[in-house]
């Protein structure tokens, strides 16, 4: 059977080779060295070299997965289905929505595959449509994350600490993707701006500055600090060169 054209074969194969190769580099090669090298000093040095190779390949693999999420084509049916559900959207509008989906997938990958919450009704609709095509979605997740990413409904900050952390995590990495300071945002990242931009029914509205809420009488926008939530796990950014996750002033929403 012909493979789906939206998933470049070279992308997928390179990621698979790197994912397998790092485990060959460590611990398999050090075990071989232990039994084949007579000198304990040589074995230790060989193991260190293998460990360095493992780390390099793991970093290369993560880079390839990020590149895949940013550049690999989505299946054509996603845009068409999204326009069926939201007929007010143009082709360029759906492209923006799918770019928001890429931001969400990147947030999951860059947080070391931790739970991330979906902040947009529009992007959630695209995600749900993708999931209904099981084989295509499974293949995408395998190349992007190495395992399946399960669907959770779109939401705003509430009383569930896990979901609040997931939303803050999404905020942090969406901001990082657009070079926005997540603690002092001057604007919203795309993923958090789409529902308001396209007037999505039941969509979520966010503001970049909590003080904006006080200046808007009758506004249905909310700020994350209204719930008294702390930062997401400080270890979220450890694997990607970040400086700790946090929602800052901009993580909020309403429906």
Summary of predicted features, one role per range:
Residues 45, 55-85:
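Transmembrane-cytosolic junction motif
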